[in-house]
Amino acid sequence: MGRAFEYVILGGGVAAGYAALEFVRRNGGASSQELCIISDEHFAPYERPALSKGYLLPQDAPRLPAFHTCVGSKDELLTEEWYNEHGIVLVLGTRVISADVRQKTLLTSSGETISYKTLIVATGARAVKLEEFGVSGSDARNVCYLRNVEDADKLVGVMRSCPGGNAVVVGGGYIGMECAAALVTNNIKVTMVFPKKHCMGRLFTPKIAEFYESYYASRGVTFVKEAAVTSMQISAGKVTAVNLGNGRRLPADMVVVGVGARANTGLFDGQLVMENGGIKVNGRMQASDASVYAVGDVAAFPVKLFGGDVRRLEHVDCARRTARHAVAAMLEGTGSVGHIDYLPFFYSRVFSLSWQFYGDNAGEAVHFGDLAPPGDGDGAAPKFGAYWVRDGRVAGAFLEGGSRQEYEAVAAAVRRGAAVADVAELERRGLAFATQATGGGGKPTCAWHATVGVAAAVSIAAFACWYGWQAPYVLKRDF
């Protein structure tokens, strides 16, 4: 038993939805048996950032279908009906257990063989489990990870089961920081444990990290840094305490784990070239086998801004843009679509804070603005940032509390590699270095993370609020 398609998208995350929309807009829809999306989830593709933000709100939290792709970029809401109307076959709740790149076939767990002429791999990444560090207990009823709706539903259920209880958050990265904020908002006491000296160690400078740690502490979060979980005490299928390598024992009514992710490349090991933990692709998002493209978290692609260095970037913006580019390259033919020119972009919003980062945090960090801890200032909303200067040019920029124009200005400074003649002068001018170079930011070309055509579910303003904790400004970056 089997089916054959011209194009198959393997994976049902953010990238799959944006690839489907790009396909329809360039191709006018899909004819019978032309395009298929295979996903092991039971839902059409959706905007995953909502899971660590609005989905965890104590009141009026959104649920599907309100945040299917592509509402996160102020575009169409792609429900299952949309896919049907445009001739796209959704194969949901289906796991692919093997792939044969040479034969161009995929074998599902039900025994069906699905063949393709062109494959887009959008398998994303999986959460790293504690067992990979020699700690058992991930199957406990109150231990939570966060990658999909099923995980988020478990997290919500566990939170509601222990109001006012103690949560241990293992990990100091994106998931840890955003989940910790959500737990506090749900009236749960939070202790964060991670092995580094500061939170967000892969991105933040120590100065920036100290600000956010102080802010979180002012909201009741306790930090246990430079410490690792060695075991968990379990009773009746639930964790009751977390034991650390330094001898401390932390009482726990629930545990949230965010210790990293690994790209889902296993189906293609030994068949496609890998690099940096992902499937290596060229600037057209094409893998070592010309019939295969890879997008999103699973793709390792050359970043022009970094001199063509191959990077794997785990963020929703990258998933959206690489998906669109791959479909454009796939449909337009060799040579007609150039290589992707991506400006790396990351953001987060927690409590009343909102930051964005562009480029690369390589080189000398030059801070600006007021990084005074909460309670030390005048009560105004914080606004500060940093530039990273490498070889006399701006390689990256971070900004907390910016306006639309200001975010656009710092992004433009990174994109053009603004020249820095004097680091001391850069520190003195701070944000003005970027905004004055663009005439005060110019006309905003940015948009709220909002939605069109979903008024029956939520208003545009309400969607913007829960999608990004009063969503961040997101640039429509065409430069």
UniProtKB/Swiss-Prot annotation:
It comes from the Eukaryota. Residues 1-3, 467-479 are cytoplasmic. The keyword Cytoplasm does not apply. Residues 25-445 are peroxisomal. FAD binds at residues 12-15, 41, 48, 53, 147-148, 297, 316, 347. Its main location: membrane. Signal peptide: none annotated. Belongs to the FAD-dependent oxidoreductase family. Catalyzes the conversion of monodehydroascorbate to ascorbate, oxidizing NADH in the process. Ascorbate is a major antioxidant against reactive oxygen species (ROS) and nitric oxide (NO). This is Monodehydroascorbate reductase 1, peroxisomal. It comes from Oryza sativa subsp. japonica. The gene is MDAR1.
